[in-house]
């Protein structure tokens, strides 16, 4: 058996207190935008989520543990294991409900599910603002910043930013660790063996 936990359902990452963000906000002056990241899948997705949070922190976002407190809602999905795909869709739908109750909130779907099925997801999940492939985790804050400020829900279509799958990151890339104590995951490969 593996020493890593089985990721059969999504795991919510709650790290708001760990961030010390540092760029400009599209909200009222003096108010930092807030991001909530929910991770579904394997330890590789955990690493990608940590890198996303580091990228958001570098763009002056606060990472928050509660979806209700966020302006940007991100689901980092799994697209390979059946149960994790179902959990990914469940997480997307849960955060879509949160988005409906908030003015100008954004919903972003990234990870393997988005990489593999972005066209189908964009058709079936119009409440999602942005689909990002698995190779662009650290660019998500930039992509969110390019979305229209106040989109007309009746006219907008989801934006797809899906390119080359998978990326191994430079060790100096900003990262917010979700590990407990002195442990963390190290991503040494890209892809999925579907063995979990």
Spans of model-derived segments:
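Proteins enriched for Cys/Gly/acidic motifs involved in redox and nucleic-acid/cofactor modification
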Residues: 4-195
């Amino acid at each position: 058996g593996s020493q890593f936990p089985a990721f059969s359902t999504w795991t919510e990452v709650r790290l708001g207190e760990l961030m010390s963000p540092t760029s400009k906000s599209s909200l009222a002056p003096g108010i930092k935008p807030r991001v909530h990241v929910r991770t579904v899948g394997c330890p590789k997705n955990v690493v990608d989520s940590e890198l996303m949070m580091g990228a958001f922190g570098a763009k002056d976002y606060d990472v928050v543990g509660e979806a209700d407190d966020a302006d940007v809602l991100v689901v980092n999905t799994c697209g390979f294991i059946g149960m994790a795909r179902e959990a990914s869709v469940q997480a997307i739908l849960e955060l879509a409900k949160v988005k409906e109750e908030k003015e100008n909130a954004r919903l972003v779907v990234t990870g393997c599910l988005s990489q593999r099925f972005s066209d189908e997801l964009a058709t079936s999940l119009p409440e999602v603002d942005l689909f990002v492939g698995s190779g662009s985790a650290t660019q998500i804050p930039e992509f969110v910043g390019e979305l229209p400020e106040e989109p007309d829900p009746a006219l907008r279509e989801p934006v797809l930013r899906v390119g080359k799958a998978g990326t191994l990151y430079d060790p100096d890339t900003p990262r917010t660790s979700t590990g407990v104590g002195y442990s963390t995951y190290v991503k040494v490969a890209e892809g999925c063996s579907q063995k979990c």
